[in-house]
Amino acid sequence: MSIEKVYDYFHNYDSKVYQIFACMGNEPSEKDILNFEKQYDISLPDDFKEFTMSPLGGLYMEVREELWPRAKVYDVAPFWTFCRGIMVYGIAKGIPDYLDIRVKTKELHDEGLEDYIPFFSIIGDGNTIFCFDKNNRIVALDWYFKVAFEEDEMNFSDFLLKKIKELEERKMQMIETLENRKN
């Protein structure tokens, strides 16, 4: 199962490159997940539920500041240079609002976008949020235009691994960009 590949990645990730926060120790129970599903009359994908109930649920993963400095107010740069991390929303007790799937779902539904359950976003991209639609397909939802675009057909685990790979590619590009500025 591809969720094992996700766990393998995080067992071996480079902690000198990424800082990672997750619910570790505050994992939600199966009952917490069922209550959320019942509230929104949905059934979340099994691999997402497993991930959410693991110590990695409510994941915040960001390239360390020393390697990829945060943008300053009024910085002008290519869009990708602002996208220095990822977040997977969770249901853990005491989870910050910006990582809480319940808070994010309420925000989305209050905007009239009730056919979607948000579960993922890229740090630095305030317009796009990734959601499960009513059929558990993964869609990229543009907050501004309120339009959903279907992602490639894949499960949550493969999607997460793809987004981590894209983050690693951006990190390498940023390191190269910063090196070129020094020379």
Where do the protein language model's features map onto the residues?
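Short, surface-exposed, charged loop/turn segments at secondary-structure junctions
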Residues: 65-66, 132-137
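Short strand-connecting beta-turns/loops that link adjacent beta-strands
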Residues: 124-125, 135
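Acidic, carboxylate-rich catalytic segments that either coordinate divalent cations
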Residues: 166-182
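Intrinsically disordered, low-complexity regulatory segments enriched in Ser/Thr/Pro
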Residues: 136-146
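Short, surface-exposed beta-strand/loop micro-motifs that present aromatic residues
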Residues: 118, 127-132
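Compact, glycine/acidic-enriched structural inserts
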Residues: 149-169
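A surface-exposed partner-binding patch
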Residues: 1-124, 181
